């Protein structure tokens, strides 16, 4: 079973190296079974140059700015039976790849996803994020099993089968940012099993949360989740790119 990593990247020279290192540290155990595709999404910094400096990494250029354009370009360039979508400011947690491959080997899934763990928050902030995730989980259960109107996918930490993604026509490029993962979860749920588990974690940067504020970000994501679920389009059409140079190393979970 071949797996393709797709990493969209717009001006990610500060974070991309750590992301790729985390992927390569796990793919080494599966020679010939994986590929890594970085989608250079109209970057003006050294993103493309840095990506090419890593052995075995393929760079695809997508001049149309936007997350879904980048995800779709990566999907089109990939060859794997599974497509792993990882954000450029994220890093795989230990055992991530093994868990994904084992899960798809033993279960017929359209998609497999889990939460992101912010590695650069204070303990108090981390507790608040966990409370938000608990609320999101309850919402997911109600929507999927009671209202039957959708499912849940974490956009920067999900793996999808090529067959399922082809059935739904790929990513919805009409959605630029907010709601893109809710949209694809809803559509994938129509063609197969969309499984979300807190057991599949991904380290990621809290740069957007720090820039926008926890309350603002939580409200914005919640509104767009419901809007996309029930009206099939996001409430918020615009977004701001958050980029920074400071790097914080992820800490293992205690």
Give each language-model segment a name.
Residues 12-27:
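Short, well-formed alpha-helical segments that are part of the catalytic scaffolds
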Residues 14-17, 44-53:
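Acidic helix N-cap motif at the loop->helix transition within catalytic regions
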Residues 22, 40-48, 90:
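A conserved acidic beta->alpha catalytic loop
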Residues 62-78:
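Glycine-rich, basic loop-to-helix element that forms the pyrophosphate-binding segment
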Residues 83:
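Short aromatic/hydrophobic "clamp" motif used to bind/position activated sugar donors
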Residues 95-126:
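Conserved donor NDP-sugar-binding/catalytic core segment of glycosyltransferases
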Residues 114-120, 129-151:
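Short, flexible, basic/aromatic active-site loop/helix in glycosyltransferases
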Residues 177-184:
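Acidic donor-binding loop at a coil-to-helix junction in glycosyltransferase catalytic cores
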């Amino acid at each position: 079973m071949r797996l393709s990593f797709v990493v969209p990247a717009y001006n990610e020279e500060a974070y991309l190296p750590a992301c790729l290192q985390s992927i390569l540290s796990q793919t080494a155990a599966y020679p010939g079974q994986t590929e890594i595709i970085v989608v250079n999404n109209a970057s003006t910094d050294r993103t493309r140059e840095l990506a090419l400096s890593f052995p075995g990494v393929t760079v695809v250029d997508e001049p149309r700015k936007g997350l879904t354009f980048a995800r779709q370009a990566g999907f089109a360039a990939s060859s794997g039976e599974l497509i792993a979508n990882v954000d450029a400011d994220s890093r795989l947690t230990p055992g991530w790849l093994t868990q994904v491959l084992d899960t798809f080997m033993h279960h017929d899934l359209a998609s497999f996803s889990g939460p992101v763990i912010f590695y650069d928050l204070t303990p108090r902030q981390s507790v608040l994020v966990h409370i938000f995730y608990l609320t999101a989980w309850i919402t997911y259960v109600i929507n999927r099993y009671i209202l039957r109107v959708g499912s849940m996918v974490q956009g920067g930490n999900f793996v999808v089968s090529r067959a399922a993604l082809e059935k739904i026509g790929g990513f919805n490029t009409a959605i630029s940012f907010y709601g893109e993962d809710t949209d694809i979860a809803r559509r994938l749920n129509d063609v197969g099993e969309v499984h979300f588990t807190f057991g599949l974690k991904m380290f990621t940067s809290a740069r957007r949360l720090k820039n926008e504020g926890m309350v603002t970000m939580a409200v914005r994501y919640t509104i767009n989740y419901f809007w996309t679920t029930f009206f099939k389009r996001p409430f918020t059409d615009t977004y701001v790119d958050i980029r920074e140079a400071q790097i914080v190393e992820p800490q293992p979970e205690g």
